[in-house]
């Protein structure tokens, strides 16, 4: 099985891009190795890795930047690029660097476990004789919404929202779809659209110009994976009532009255009774971090 990596990243003198690949076997054991990529223009970095271990069942990877041999920058990596293994396929990855997204707060446990619990089960995607896979993140989707694909040819609805090709959720806020490349005409122009998860009814187009597939074709026994920039739709801003309080101001009959952490439980109960949903605490510092006069000014 061959893995071909390709990513756009403009480097400076002394910098290079490397990919860290983690292989997972049937027993869940992992092995990680980092491979240097090559470039001709300091902009497009490419590399190839050959996997010969037949026990491997899946793999994931991320990119890092090295400067004079030392790693100094790594991708955000909160959502790993994870794929199941098909030893009959050659994988071609066309990636974009993953910076911390503007909507990174939607990936925190406050949202994924409390405000908007994420309970959707991820689904596996089918492979074809020649496979085109498109992936995009869409954390701004509302409950009851899903993502679909529309394009400039019959296989993708010819821009008719009534024939949008529905995508599957394959990770946290990550939506993917696989197409048989034999049914796709290149060049391919497309957009992602929001649909109703139950009825499939059209909801909204993403903004901006049409996306254009950065490849000219897919050969037999190849899986071309296109990891697109995030969905271009402005989501509704989540709002809630809350209270701000420093821990040292908390007082209760069951504590010493000097801001015990145990008083936070009572504070949470009071917040719930008042109908509020958020508690913001002022920073709590270890006041012995510097061991000098600065420790008396934690802010």
Name every feature range the model reports, one short phrase each.
Residues 1-11, 94-145, 222-236:
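Basic K/R-rich, polyanion-interacting modules in nucleoproteins and related proteins
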Residues 2-13, 20-22, 134-137, 243-252:
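Short, Lys/Arg-rich amphipathic segments at extreme N-termini
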Residues 10-56, 66-86, 140-186, 195-218, ...:
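Aromatic-rich carbohydrate-binding modules that target alpha-glucans
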Residues 89:
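Catalytic "initiation/cleavage/transfer" segments centered on a nucleophilic residue
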Residues 126-127, 192, 270:
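Non-catalytic accessory regions flanking glycosidase/transglycosidase catalytic cores in CAZymes
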Residues 202, 207-236, 262-266, 278, ...:
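Extended acidic/polar, glycine-enriched regions
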Residues 232-299:
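Acidic/aromatic-lined carbohydrate-recognition and catalytic surfaces
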